[in-house]
């Protein structure tokens, strides 16, 4: 569904930009009743705020810092030194004035180069008059192959609407860093704020993470919320839109993130190395353009670990989830990774090592897809374990969660924590032994199992299975439609199915289906078996705009639909 919405909204991109520009020129939310400009709550001032560290290149010798001030501050600089020395070095920032939907501010960025590896530094930012408090950072040591980082996702907050409260993620991260003081940086899997095109949301996020990301590099992945906005937020948010690029994200963070992404889509796409690991960060836009860059990027690294992030899970836990938004394009680079971290679904899950939609046992055989839960206490109520998941936790308690990733040479351990310290999953990958713990063998079935979006149709399909005859796959399709909430009428020699605004009538002994789009000729005749009418999988799927595949190694057929609508058969009210 997101891909369809994306295509439609991309067509409206230019129109939306014009609307936004006009809105900004009016300054509707920055003018009082007397026509005077005023600052919003949490707006920029002469004192630096939104201070944040990031890796911009080689973490052994480089570090980037960003901050924000009001426009009265015409220039800025960072003043830094090695801890234990008094010799301060000043580096002037590059800066740019930005008019957002509610404010006008000057944004500052500095990339420090020529630093010493494994060295602690102290720094302040601002201009000659208005300085920040002192913060610290540490560069990566030489020959580092033992380190840890924390990954979080979906810590966005939409309320209170005009002053969003990000204290949940801030509280969680402060606790996590007290629990794991050895962590080197924070990594995210997207949805860092609720509406990334709106300034007040970033104000909330920076307020929540104050006291953390000034001294801990914060490497973000964009999610759909980071990419969206509202034309106006007052008195209530109206005019929701998505842009072709995560414009405000790219503006704020592109200057401090590695400038090595695909042309036209840097900022939200980048890669970096730390220790013996390579990190590939994938934005949600233009996957067909991002994919060649991503694959080429991975071919160039010789790091032991290849870790990636992409907000939308390829193998979802949502009952309506689907993966065709980007996977057809991104499959090639993603299958080069050891782990792909995702978010979006606000629960935890991880897959068996997966490649070509088949499930394996050994980490060398595929990519582990790891959904990181949520860092903001934002819960979903209908998530469930799918056939491709070796581990799952619904996370329906209103508190945040995070994952600690520890790398020690050829061994990686990912430990998933609730905010209060309870552990709900531990995964270890040992490259030397080609072993993934805890032990979990990927299923292989004797009868060809049937699943829809990863949900096994076991209860309704007991003792039923798909069959292959003369190279054609057949299935009791009425059972599939019943299982997903569609309408099914079974009569002596016919089967009527209705779902997703389509319908079809299948008849025993016929290779033709009567549908809402006319007569469809199928690759085989419908037949009775096991008290069900079996019809060809290929044509029946196409009639209902579904996709399907047969995972040969595991012997199951999975149907999918690009729609995230739920075709529930509701009881009539009249």
Question: Predicted regions span which residues?
Answer:
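Primary recognition of N-terminal secretory signal peptides and signal-anchoring hydrophobic helices
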Residues: 437-574
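Outer-membrane beta-barrel translocator/channel fold
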Residues: 316-327
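Active-site neighborhood of phospho(di)ester-bond hydrolases with catalytic His/Asp-centered motifs
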Residues: 151-153, 185-191, 218-224, 282-283, ...
